[in-house]
């Protein structure tokens, strides 16, 4: 199926960056498509919801953290589309560099801080759409 014959699912994705080198990834829980795969936190936009508000809501629901939408703490980095067997998604990828609270897996998901600068991640498997995000962020931070 092509994107034209499937609805596009809008998703807000938050890359939490700690100490300019570590990003937080979560393991998809059982019962979800791609269960056991690692991804960046986030979720679907609700009808008429902005990316910023969806990101705030999702990070609170999934991790119990509050984020500021101040431009010095948060920014939308990129938009990518990915065609998964279960959904065609448009991912609004946001960099979050400051938050309140300590991230906890409130949906029973495992969490892991991963170094952007090691040759490979220590978690596996990783959702296919996460790789372009990682590569973009590495290039962005090296500017």
Q: Each predicted region: which residue ranges?
A:
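Generic C-terminal helix-cap and adjacent flexible tail
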Residues: 4-6, 138-143
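Conserved N-terminal beta-strand and adjoining loop/helix that marks the start
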Residues: 2-23, 44
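A short coil-to-beta-strand element that immediately follows conserved catalytic motifs
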Residues: 66-77
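NUDIX/MutT-family hydrolases
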Residues: 95, 103-139
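Active-site-adjacent beta-strand/loop module that shapes the phosphate/pyrophosphate-binding cleft
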Residues: 9, 18, 77-102, 116, ...
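Conserved Nudix-box catalytic region and its N-terminal flanking loop in Nudix hydrolases
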Residues: 22-61
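A generic structural micro-feature
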Residues: 5-8, 37, 85-88, 105-108
């Amino acid at each position: 199926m092509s994107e034209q014959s499937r609805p596009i699912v809008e998703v807000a994705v938050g890359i939490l960056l700690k100490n300019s080198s570590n990003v937080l990834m979560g393991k998809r829980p059982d019962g979800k498509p791609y269960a056991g795969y690692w991804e960046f936190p986030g979720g679907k936009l609700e009808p008429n919801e902005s990316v910023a508000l969806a990101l705030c809501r999702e990070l609170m629901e999934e991790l119990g953290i509050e984020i500021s939408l101040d431009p010095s703490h948060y920014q939308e980095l990129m938009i990518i589309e990915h065609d998964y067997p279960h959904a065609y998604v448009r991912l609004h990828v946001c960099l979050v560099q400051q938050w309140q609270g300590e991230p906890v897996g409130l949906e029973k998901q495992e969490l892991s801080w991963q170094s952007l600068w090691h040759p490979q991640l220590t978690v596996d498997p990783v959702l296919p759409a996460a790789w372009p995000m990682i590569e973009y962020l590495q290039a962005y931070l090296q500017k």
